[in-house]
Amino acid sequence: MKRFTLIVLVSLFSLSAWSKKKEFPLIGEKAPSFSESSTNGVLNFPEDFGDNWKILFSHPLDFTAVCTSELCGLAYNQEKFDSLGVKIAVVSIDEIDRHLLWKEFMERTMSEDGEAIEIAYPIVADLSGEVSEKYGMLHASANEKRNVRGVFIIDPDNIIQSISFYPINVGRNIDELLRTVAALQLTQKENVLTPYNWQPGDDVLVPHKPYTEDELKENPELKNQYYNKGEFMWYKKMNKSGKK
C-alpha cells in the first residue's frame, strides 16, 4: 500500500512538473504582454496594436531559406492583412542588429512581380527567450534554443483565438492564415460557423435550425436564406455568385 501511495505521489508530482513546464496561454485566454526591441523600435505587445486584430508569428532563425520565404510572404500580403485590420509582430531569438540586416537584405533583394517589398511589420529581438517562453514557442525536442514556427491570432480584446505550431522544416501557408482570420472575424460578428474548406464569401453553418414552422409561415423568405443537408447541418446563404 505504501509503495502504491508513493508511486501515485511521484506520478502526480511528475504530472504537475510537466504541466508547469509546458504551460503557455491557450485559446480563450489573455495574450501575455511584453516589451522588447524590434526593427520598428520598442514594441509593447499587444498594447501598441490597440483594438486591432493581432498576429504573433515566430520563426527559428534569421537569414535562413524557409524563414525568409515566410517573412516575404507576409510582406507580399500586407495589403490583405491591412484590409482585415490585422497588425503583425514577428519574433525570434536573434539580436536586433541581425534583424535589421536581414530586413534590409529582404527589402533590397526580394521582390514580387519586379517590385521591391517593404517589411512594414516589426521583427522582435527576443534575445533572452522570455517572449518565446511566455508563448510556448520553445520546444526542446525540436530545438531548445530556437523557436518553432508558431502563430497566435489575437482579437481586439487581446484574447487568443487561434494557435498553431509548425515544425522547423515546414513553411506556413499565408493564405490559410488570412482565411483563419476572416473566419474568426465573421464568426465573432455573427452567430455562424464555418465548414471545412470555407473561403470568404462561401455559405456558412448556423448552430441550429434557424426558424420554426410558425416563423416560416409568417416570413416565407426565410426559406430562401437558409438550406439544410440532413437533420442538423443548416447553412446560411452568403449571397456569393454561384451559391444557393
Where are these regions (language model features)?
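Sec-dependent signal peptide recognition
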Residues: 2-8
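Hydrophobic h-region of N-terminal signal peptides that target proteins for export
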Residues: 10-18
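Chalcogenol-based redox active-site neighborhoods
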Residues: 18-244
